[in-house]
Amino acid sequence: KKPFIFEKDDIRIGFYLCTENEFTMATCHTMGANPFDVLDSFDEVKVLKAQCDYVIVLYHGGKEFYRYPSPMLQRYCRKFVDSGANLVICQHNHCVGSREDYQGGTIIYGQGNFIFNSDFYVNHQEFVKDAILLTVDVTKDDFVVSELPIRRTDNGTRLATEVEATETLEAYRKRSEEIKDPHFVTQAYKAFADTHVKRYLREFLGRSFIVRAINALL
């Protein structure tokens, strides 16, 4: 739960990390990741910002294989910026998402995967073929975030070629323009949810002990 503060050349950068509901979250009795708490997390970022020149929030949240923020995720990330964050990076969607420049801060809704070779993700080439690294140029007076596209191959991860980088960044910038419209964010997420609700229900029921027991009896 304690944030990390990095200091160099008289510049202090605070890092605040948290996660949405995951099996790895810390509890009163076990170690684990810092859980996001809508009642505490924003205030903790405010306290951190009072000690630093800049704050970076790493937020493990978002929907897998969804390239846009949900309306609620967008509200959370904007609230982090309102609380003092200069950069908010969301990590859970496992694909290159979109970028929002908001109130002087930067929000990245998904970088993609650097190295993630499990069969589940390899079978979703549309989403895992590319990713972006982030570079942050920092001075006392400026904080600039830029993207560097990379590609996953059978031999590992490499920098994208000029053509590949253009492909990744053009799609990324198009999505970044689309999310400037709040109606788009809402409607796109509704469409995504409508197409996935049946799959989620199937997976939930398929993993249910009671359903498995009934199936075995029948």
Q: What is the role of each PLM region?
A:
Residues 1-5:
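A substrate-binding/cap region within the structured catalytic cores of diverse enzymes
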Residues 6-10, 101-102, 138:
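Active-site beta-strand termini and strand-to-loop segments that position acidic
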Residues 16, 56, 92, 109, ...:
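Divalent metal-coordination and catalytic microenvironments
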Residues 125-218:
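A short C-terminal boundary segment appended to hydrolase-like catalytic domains
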Residues 21-39, 63-66, 115-126:
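Acidic/histidine-rich helix-loop elements
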Residues 17-20, 59-63, 111, 147-149:
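Short, structured patches in soluble enzyme cores that scaffold and shape functional sites
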Residues 8-58, 75, 158-159:
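Binuclear metal-dependent hydrolase catalytic cores centered on His/Asp/Glu-rich metal-binding motifs
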Residues 69-132:
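Conserved beta-sheet core of the metallophosphoesterase superfamily
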